[in-house]
Amino acid sequence: MLSDVEVGAFLSGGVDSGYLASASGADQAFTVGFDEGDRYSEVNKAAKVAEKTGLKHHVKIISKQEFWDALPDVMYHMDEPLGDASAVALYFLSKEAAGHVKVVLSGEGADELFGGYNIYREPEALKKVAWIPFVLRRAVRKLAAKLPDVKGRDFLIRAGMKVEERFIGNAYIYCEKEKAQILKNKVTGPSTQEYLSQFYEELESENRGSLQDMEKMQSVDLNYWLPGDILQKADKMSMAHSLEVRVPFLDKEIFNFAAKLPKEAKIAAGTTKYIFRKAVSEFLPQETNERKKLGFPIPIRVWLRQNDWYQMVTDLFTSKEAEEFFHTEKLLQLLNDHKDKKADNSRKIWTVLTFLIWYDRFFTTCSK
């Protein structure tokens, strides 16, 4: 890669960033982690990649108080509420990198192009029941929906749905019924499913019904999740620190190459990104190349069950701003059920939490 300045790379313990850091000619690598055990920190795994490739490795460990304190600034630079906690990690990662380089490489796009998300394996799993007539699967789905949350329930429900119904992208957090329960004002716009139905129809028409379910899922993510979340937060969090982020996997030639690959080249042998992993294996430690997709592990699930965060979120959920938009007793129920480990409501809580912080930053604080 040609550049007039020293180039760094964002480095997690995964295959995408590991390959970029190893093969691109980057000079330095940057990783963030959390002091919540290996499950929520990829620092040690990233260090092995950096050691193998001889990269100078910079690490930032983010405390939960730092994370909380940064939220107003993160929401300010995002310009809009974003229910994706990894934006905060990217904020700190960009800040760390900006102290050393002007340009960094990042692995955005590889999962969408080469089939890296675990949910893309679902169509293959559902083939086990494909021999059952759809009308029967639909009937079983209705019965399963009435069951308590037991193992296998979700599979039965999703087996009775077409991909156009069951997959609306990685950003799915609240169903329409849940939205109606927590919001004081009725949502007048189309539901997420209704919004995407036109896209699915156009996709079907353009490809004359030739796309497999996984390819439809990739198309949704490439057209909505990637530009609406992944690239937005990378761009805005890096620009908050005057850092330029480049995303080589989204080069036009790579995009066109990946688009021609059959499904079997992406999901095979029980793994995601099959052909990609094969192609880059020589650049990475074996354990890195064989790792399952983890995403950006953020310990908000843990922190929301700890007393300090629980109290801070309770204060927000009972504020006058929360009262304006939400049935606060429903918010507190989500929070309490999560703290008591009755459910994992972390993403639902986080989505409301970031909206309230964004609203306070732009409308309450600014008006003062």
What is each model feature region?
Residues E6-T53, H58-V59:
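ATP-dependent adenylation/pyrophosphate-handling site
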Residues L55, S86, G99, V103-L105, ...:
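Adenosyl-5′-phosphate
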Residues M1-V5:
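A long, amphipathic alpha-helix that forms part
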Residues V43-H77, T192-E201:
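A conserved beta-strand->alpha-helix junction
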Residues H58, D79-G83, A125-W131, E264-I267:
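Short, polar/flexible loop-turn hinges at active-site or ligand-entry regions and domain interfaces
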Residues F92-K151, W225, I230, A234-I254:
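Active-site adenylate/phosphate-handling loop in enzymes that bind or generate adenylated species
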Residues V15-D16, D35-G37, Q65-E66, A110-E112, ...:
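Short, solvent-exposed loop/turn segments at secondary-structure junctions
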Residues S24-A26, V43-K45, V74-M75, N118-E122, ...:
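Short, glycine/charged-enriched secondary-structure capping and boundary segments
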